């Protein structure tokens, strides 16, 4: 979607469900890529890990900054939220040059309360993305 001659917004896949409104799965769940002439910024939104990250990286990567979900995780939610190692792998799949963790320290759901989201991060490789 061209937002202006200086900004294009790509609406891309994410893996989650939609729970807004009276019925589930009646609205779209997505991630976004913001492209300017100078850089590409990816926002994962809530998403479980999946092959969509590699597909996005293959089509649009590398991205300059990936703002990645990292805070509502629990093994029971693995299809809709990522564990820290999956977040790092997704950033690697996107070929992100830098990563900004989202949701860090924001959880109030059952098993995630009090978990330190940043300590679970592992960067995929020495030349992999930096954490902002």
From Swiss-Prot:
Record SUPFAM superfamilies: Metallo-hydrolase/oxidoreductase
Pfam families assigned: Lactamase_B_2 (PF12706)
Chief location category: membrane
Domain of life of the organism encoding this protein: Bacteria
GO cellular component, one term: cell outer membrane
InterPro entries linked: Metallo-B-lactamas (IPR001279), RibonucZ/Hydroxyglut_hydro (IPR036866)
Location of this chain's protein in the cell: Cell outer membrane
UniProtKB keywords: Cell outer membrane, Membrane
Disulfide bonds listed in the record: none
Family: To M.tuberculosis Rv0906.
Protein name: Outer membrane protein RomA
Species of provenance: Klebsiella pneumoniae
Gene behind this protein: romA
């Amino acid at each position: 979607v061209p937002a202006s001659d200086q900004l294009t917004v790509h609406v891309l896949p994410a893996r989650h469900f939609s729970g807004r409104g009276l019925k589930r799965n009646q609205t779209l769940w997505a991630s976004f890529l913001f492209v300017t002439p100078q850089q590409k910024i990816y926002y994962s939104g809530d998403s479980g890990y999946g092959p969509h990250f590699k597909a996005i990286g293959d089509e649009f990567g590398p991205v300059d900054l990936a703002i990645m979900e990292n805070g509502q995780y629990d093994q029971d939610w693995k299809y809709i939220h990522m564990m820290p190692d999956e977040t790092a792998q997704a950033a690697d799949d996107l070929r992100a040059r830098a990563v900004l963790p989202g949701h860090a320290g924001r959880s109030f759901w059952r098993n995630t309360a009090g978990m330190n989201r940043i300590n679970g991060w592992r960067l995929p490789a020495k030349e992999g993305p930096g954490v902002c």
